[in-house]
């Protein structure tokens, strides 16, 4: 009897212990699940766009948008090499352009472009169309074959390296299709040959800068300069963009009468053209100019450069947004070389410095430190900003927006897979002010802004970030613009009206 009791007690205690252990494990897993949900919710709450609450109509757009996004992501897991952000944009441009996701983003009012350069804007087709203008001459470099263009009533003077012929005659001689194909290859970096994608940074930059040389004489003809700017406003407006802050070197312009136009006169051309376009398009918010000469000026030339900055600011206090320096950072002079004279400029002149457009650490990227110390309002590219925690602290504290240009950073060899772009970290934390821009869309045959928004949404952003992200990025482009508080208020009202049209149209 006693032995039976012992057996019964042992069996009962084993069951109890098993039951107790199961209960404990269930509690531990429940606590783990709760903490995991909390982590995910906290991360989502920290991401850019999380403060936005979508309306019922916006939810309809969001459902379709996320359905398309998740399809791309799931397909990418099954076929990593087919995932669009893994690829070079040149290899998937045709796929992007034909996708419903891209079409929705393109129709979406995206606010403003805050980072774009003067002669790298319009579609290649439009630039080629300009070569049909009368009085246009060309020559080809005997070594590189690179074209030069010049408008003139008479044949320009030949040199050892340049024999001028009329473009019309050359096109007739070669055949229109052959000529235009050769010209296109010099006006665009677009190329589906992987070897061309995988060159080193300096080689890519030489090709990039070479395009500015090819289109220089064509676009700096004063009548064409204005027409080109107006055309970009038209293309930009059609791409769902209502506002522009344009970086320009203000290169000397010329006309057929031998007149050379200086920086003040060129600013006036921009100003008049902007007013003209706004009059014709009432929902266009406007444009401002950032004077951005190339960062190769020697010490002796810096004071004169700063004098020009002051002059332009005095003559166009509302239209000139501020000052920047452009060109390949790795090869150009660093900001510290200009700092002494920059510090002498009046406080009313704002800065929008390119900084950190590099993969180096502790070298070229130190421009980020100088940009912040000099009081920049925004940072152009800021690709290396994650390597500088002190700069990141100032970016947060002083609301210094980072102008992220995804497509440019890939084409110019900073990143291969968009998922590895440092902008992903910025989009994951709403404390970082960030805007998406396009830099030089003409050179990679991209739309003024839609392709960069697309890559940011599908490649840089989390799978969970949705329409709220895109809406916030559009809002940020107004919030961190150079507009005055009053101008920003009016701009927001104009953008909101277009956003409502977009949402209503989708729900119709």
From Swiss-Prot:
One of its GO terms (biological process) is adenosine catabolic process. It is found in: Secreted. Its main location: secreted. GO terms for molecular function: adenosine deaminase activity; metal ion binding. InterPro entries: A_deaminase_dom, A_deaminase_N, ADGF, Ado/ade_deaminase, Metal_Hydrolase. It catalyses: adenosine + H2O + H(+) = inosine + NH4(+). Catalyzes the deamination of adenosine to inosine. Belongs to the metallo-dependent hydrolases superfamily. Adenosine and AMP deaminases family. ADGF subfamily. This is Adenosine deaminase. It comes from Lutzomyia longipalpis. The lineage of its organism: Eukaryota, Metazoa, Ecdysozoa, Arthropoda, Hexapoda. The gene is ADA.
């Amino acid at each position: 009897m006693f032995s039976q009791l012992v057996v019964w007690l042992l069996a009962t205690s084993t069951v109890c212990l098993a039951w107790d252990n199961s209960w404990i494990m269930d509690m531990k897993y429940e606590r783990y699940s709760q903490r995991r949900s909390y982590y995910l919710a906290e991360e989502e709450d920290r991401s850019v766009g999380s403060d936005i609450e979508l309306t019922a109509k916006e939810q309809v757009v969001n459902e379709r948008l996320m359905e398309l996004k998740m399809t791309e992501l799931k397909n990418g897991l099954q076929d990593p090499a087919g995932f669009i952000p893994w690829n070079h944009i040149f290899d998937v441009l045709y796929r992007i352009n034909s996708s419903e996701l891209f079409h929705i983003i393109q129709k979406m009012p995206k606010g403003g472009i805050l980072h774009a350069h003067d002669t790298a804007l319009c579609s290649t087709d439009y630039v080629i169309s300009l070569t049909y203008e009368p009085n246009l001459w060309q020559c080809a470099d005997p070594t590189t074959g690179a074209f030069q263009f010049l408008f003139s009533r008479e044949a320009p003077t030949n040199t050892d390296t340049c024999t001028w012929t009329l473009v019309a005659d050359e096109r007739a001689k070669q055949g229109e299709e052959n000529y235009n194909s050769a010209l296109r290859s010099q006006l665009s970096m677009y190329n589906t040959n992987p070897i061309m994608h995988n060159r080193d940074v300096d080689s890519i930059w030489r090709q990039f800068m070479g395009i500015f040389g090819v289109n220089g004489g064509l676009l700096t003809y004063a009548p064409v300069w204005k027409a080109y700017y107006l055309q970009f406003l038209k293309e930009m407006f059609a791409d769902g963009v209502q506002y522009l802050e344009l970086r320009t070197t203000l290169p000397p312009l010329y006309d057929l009468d031998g007149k050379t136009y200086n920086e003040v006169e060129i600013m006036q051309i921009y100003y008049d053209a902007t007013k003209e376009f706004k009059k014709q398009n009432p929902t266009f918010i406007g444009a401002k100019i950032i004077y951005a000469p190339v960062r190769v000026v020697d010490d002796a030339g810096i004071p004169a450069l700063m004098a020009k900055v002051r002059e332009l600011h005095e003559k166009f206090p509302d239209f000139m947004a501020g000052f920047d320096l452009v060109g390949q950072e790795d090869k150009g002079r660093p900001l510290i070389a200009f700092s002494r004279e920059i510090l002498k400029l009046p406080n009313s002149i704002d800065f929008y410095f390119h900084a950190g457009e590099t993969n180096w650490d502790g070298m070229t990227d130190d421009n980020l430190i100088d940009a912040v110390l000099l009081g920049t309002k925004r940072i152009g590219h800021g690709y290396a900003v994650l390597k500088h925690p002190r700069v990141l602290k100032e970016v947060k504290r002083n609301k210094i927006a980072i102008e992220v240009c995804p497509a440019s950073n890939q084409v110019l060899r900073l990143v291969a897979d968009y998922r590895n772009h440092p902008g992903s970290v910025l989009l994951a934390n709403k404390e970082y002010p960030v805007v998406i821009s396009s830099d030089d869309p003409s050179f990679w045959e991209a739309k003024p802004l839609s392709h960069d928004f697309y890559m940011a949404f599908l490649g840089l952003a989390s799978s969970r970030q949705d329409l709220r992200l895109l809406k916030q990025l559009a809002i940020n482009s107004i919030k961190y613009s150079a507009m005055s508080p009053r101008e920003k208020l009016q701009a927001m009202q104009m953008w909101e009206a277009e956003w409502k049209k977009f949402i209503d149209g989708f729900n119709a």
